[in-house]
From Swiss-Prot:
A biological-process GO annotation: photosynthesis, light reaction
GO terms, molecular function: oxidoreductase activity, acting on NAD(P)H, quinone or similar compound as acceptor; quinone binding
Name of protein: NAD(P)H-quinone oxidoreductase subunit 4L, chloroplastic
Family: Belongs to the complex I subunit 4L family.
Localisation: Plastid, Chloroplast thylakoid membrane
Membrane-spanning residues: 2-22, 32-52, 61-81
Entry-linked InterPro entries: NADH_UbQ_OxRdtase_chain4L/K (IPR001133), NUOK/Mnh_C1-like (IPR039428)
The organism of origin for this protein: Populus trichocarpa (Western balsam poplar)
One Gene Ontology CC term in the entry: NADH dehydrogenase complex
Swiss-Prot/TrEMBL keywords: Chloroplast, Membrane, NAD, NADP, Plastid, Plastoquinone, Quinone, Thylakoid, Translocase, Transmembrane, Transmembrane helix, Transport
Membrane topology qualifier: Multi-pass membrane protein
Subunit structure: NDH is composed of at least 16 different subunits, 5 of which are encoded in the nucleus.
Length: 101
């Protein structure tokens, strides 16, 4: 019974993240939605690891790996956004064309 609630929460977070990523015009909001998607995936890894094989920690270890990748993305993403803002004076995705100068 608990499995359905956790998977529902994960699907809800994933859906919000996908919707925000598709409709977002701001790069910071897109990065936040990407974090929501990664957190939903982590919830699935931990839930299925606990539900199917609680003695082996493969899902938990992989979720720690995904958390470290998300931390690197959270550190590098705003730095890239700030450098784009410094050069282009905008962080709107539809106004950026990095191939033209």
């Amino acid at each position: 019974m608990m499995l359905e609630y956790v998977l529902g929460l994960s699907a809800y977070l994933f859906s919000i993240g996908i919707y925000g990523l598709i409709t977002s015009r701001n790069m910071v909001r897109a990065l936040m939605c990407l974090e929501l998607i990664l957190n939903a995936v982590n919830i699935n890894f931990v839930t299925f690891s606990d539900f199917f094989d609680s003695r082996q920690l493969k899902g938990n270890i992989f979720s720690i790996f995904v958390i470290s990748i998300a931390a690197a993305e959270a550190a590098i993403g705003p730095a890239i956004v700030s450098s784009i803002y410094r050069n282009r004076k905008s962080i709107r995705i539809n106004q950026l064309n990095l191939l033209n100068k």
